[in-house]
Structure formats: structure tokens, C-alpha cells
Amino acid sequence: MACFHLLSFGAMCRAGLLGNRCVAEGNRWEIRCQHLQFSKHGYNASSQLMFGIRPRLPISEEDRQWTDNGFDQLSRLLGHQRMLHAKVVLPDAEHFPDRYDRSIAAAEKMFCRVCEYMDLDRRRVDFEVFPDATDELRDLVPYWQSSQGGCAGLYVHPEGEKDRMVVALRQSQMEDPLAVVATLAHELGHVILLGGGLLERGAKDMEPLTDLLTVFLGFGVFNANCAARFRQWQNNQCQGWSMQRLGYLPEEIYGYALARFAQERSEQRPPWASYLSTNVRSYFKGSLEWLQAENKRAKGAIT
């Protein structure tokens, strides 16, 4: 019988044994990494245009403009080249070769790798794990302030300590390695934007922009797949289902953001898209077809 502590992160992903719980806003849900394959024909917006059919964008025009403006803002803050050269991080043994046994030590190894992929100096950021009980957290981290007692992770920059930042992970979050990476990528995004003085904490849309940053820096597969989770359960007496969220952006916007990411990098058939969950990949595919069609239409108008 396979034991989780004997499997690497990548092996767990391939075997479909990726944890049982993920915590966001105090909720838990089952999670499973879904490896989906491209159709043999790929994404073909040209065939639709040939018959006068224009692909339909799966998000609203308002959401599209927000996402595009977010990419433009991040390009101004970090440089467009940073996105173009970002390493796309995937849930496999190549990117996370260490054994994951849900311990603090294993989570810290994962934290170090996420820091490396996000081009952050790990020595500037302390890693902590906080208990689920809010009262215990206040004793452990007295400078913590939050109205969200069920948050999955925390970023703290203590007053008067310019060079010290803390990223903390909720203890029950460690059950799920995919959600660990997604949460760490988001909180380390705060290190880049807030700790780096690029944004103020009270900036408009600071949290969703930080989620968008995870796509910009190559962690979109993790954060998009963790955005919404469907869970079914049953016992001898009853059965039911639930849907829970992690993060601030919905799957639809993640799908478009990933398509914009791929287009900016001239990736027409990115292999990493096979790691997207069913819903996200559908939104990604529709968005990429729309972007390709708009690009062809714009070129036709110019000529």
C-alpha cells in the first residue's frame, strides 16, 4: 500500500494522491490534480473565422479590461521581460522533487523552492506555520492583524523592521500540497508588491492583483486549479456536495489571464495547459481562441 510520506510531490500528482483538505476562509474540500490532454487539432480560431464564426469570450468585457489593465500594471511595476522569461512551475517531480509528508519541514522546503522560482531571497522572509485557532495565532504572532480568521495564509511586515517579513501558512493547509504552493505563491506575491514598496496595502484591488501576479510569474496552474473545488460525499444515511474557493479571482478570469499569459509569450499550444483542471482549461481554451481571433482581425484591419 502506497504511503504519502514515501512519495515525492510529483509522484503524488501523477498517482492522483494529492491530499484531502484545503483551507480558505475557514472551509475544507477535497482536491485532485487533473491532467488533461490537448485535442489533436489544438486550438484553432482560424477554422471558426473561415466560416464567419467569431469565438466568444468567456468573461465579461469589464473583467477582460480589468485583467488586461492588471497585466499592464504588473509590466510597469516589474518589467514586461519578467513575465516573458518567467519559469512556468508545474506540479511535477521536476519542479518539486522533494518528498512531501505534510510536515513543517516539508512545507518549508516547498517554501524555499517557491521563493527560488519567484526570484526572491529566502533569507529576507521568515516562514511560519500558524494553528487554526485564531487566539493561538494572536499569541504566536502578536503583530498579526486580520478580520479574516479563516485565511489560508498570511503576509506580515512588522512595523520598525524594514528588512524582516513573515509568510505564514495555516496548519491544516499543509494537508494539500497543491494548495500549499498556491497559498505560498500568493503570500510571496505580497512580499514582492508590498514588501518591495511597489504597492500600498490599501491600493485598489490589491488582493486580486496579487492573484494575477501568480499567473504573471508562472504559478497560474496552481492558483487557477485551486480557485474552486467541487466535493462530493456520502455515507450510509445521506450524500451531498459542496463548492469552495481559495483566493480572490474566479476560474473564468484565471482562464483568460492564462490565455493572455500564453499569447504574450507566443505560446500557441502551451504544454502546461494539460495540467489545468476541466473548468479552467475550458475558459483558457475559449479565451485563447478569442485572443487569436482578435489578433487576426486586428492584423487584417491594418493591411
Enumerate the language-model features and the residues they cover.
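Pan-zinc metallopeptidase signature
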Residues: 51-81, 239-303
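Auxiliary, metal-adjacent structural segments of Zn-dependent hydrolase domains
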Residues: 78-162, 172-178, 223
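Short pre-active-site segment immediately N-terminal to the catalytic Zn-binding motif
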Residues: 167-183, 205
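Active-site recognition of the HExxH zinc-binding catalytic motif
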Residues: 181-196
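Post-HExxH zinc-binding segment in Zn-dependent metallohydrolases
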Residues: 204-237, 241
